[in-house]
């Protein structure tokens, strides 16, 4: 699963890389993005491409497929049939992150893509209008099984949209969902860089525990 990611890039870099025509939200670089956070997503075919805001986690937020949607399930489950055909998006990202805890120590693991500092994760989005007419937009990250050398840290990784796949993925006119199965291959160790850092435990002093200054 992908439960944390970073986007350490600004609007101009995102616009240039993904050929965005209209930026419709403010963006500041973030080192940690979590489920239910608002995130930028890219939608629309060429000449109509927009960078818009969405909440990470499809309706309902507590559902199993809320923040991640396995590619096999997306292509076979009826619940995804409508949005995989015409509500695809790209979620820009600079690294995928996680925290591992074996009970003795914690370590943070981050994965970056060797092809580009900034890359696009395949996403699906949904829009609902409340009784007051306000639009609520949510999204999920499409994942697939990790490839050789990566499976030790992840059971599922985001599907990465290459530059060659960008136009077709964002074109709502491309509605043959089964074409995607053969297009996307798992990320192998030679595609990515993985960084592991041991998280230092906080050392409490008497003054800290008593509310004083260490």
Residue ranges and their predicted role:
Residues 1-214:
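Short linear sequence motif anchored by a di-proline
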């Amino acid at each position: 699963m992908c439960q944390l990611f970073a986007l350490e890039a600004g609007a101009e870099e995102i616009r240039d890389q993904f050929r965005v025509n209209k930026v419709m939200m403010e963006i500041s670089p973030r080192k940690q993005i979590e489920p239910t956070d608002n995130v930028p997503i890219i939608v629309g075919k060429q000449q109509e491409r927009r960078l818009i805001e969405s909440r990470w986690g499809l309706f309902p937020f507590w559902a199993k497929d809320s923040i991640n949607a396995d590619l096999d399930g997306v292509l076979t489950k009826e619940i995804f049939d409508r949005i995989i055909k015409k509500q695809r998006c790209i979620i820009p990202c600079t690294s995928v992150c996680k925290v591992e805890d074996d009970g003795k120590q914690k370590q943070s693991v981050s994965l970056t893509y060797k092809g580009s500092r900034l890359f696009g994760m395949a996403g699906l989005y949904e829009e609902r209008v409340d009784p007051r007419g306000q639009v609520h937009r949510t999204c999920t990250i499409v994942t697939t099984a990790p490839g050789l050398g990566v499976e030790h840290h992840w059971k599922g990784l985001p599907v990465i949209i290459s530059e060659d796949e960008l136009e077709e993925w964002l074109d709502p006119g491309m509605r043959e969902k089964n074409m995607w199965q053969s297009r996307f291959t798992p990320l192998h160790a030679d595609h990515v860089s993985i960084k592991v850092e041991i998280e230092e435990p906080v050392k409490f002093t008497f003054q800290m525990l008593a509310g004083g200054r260490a």
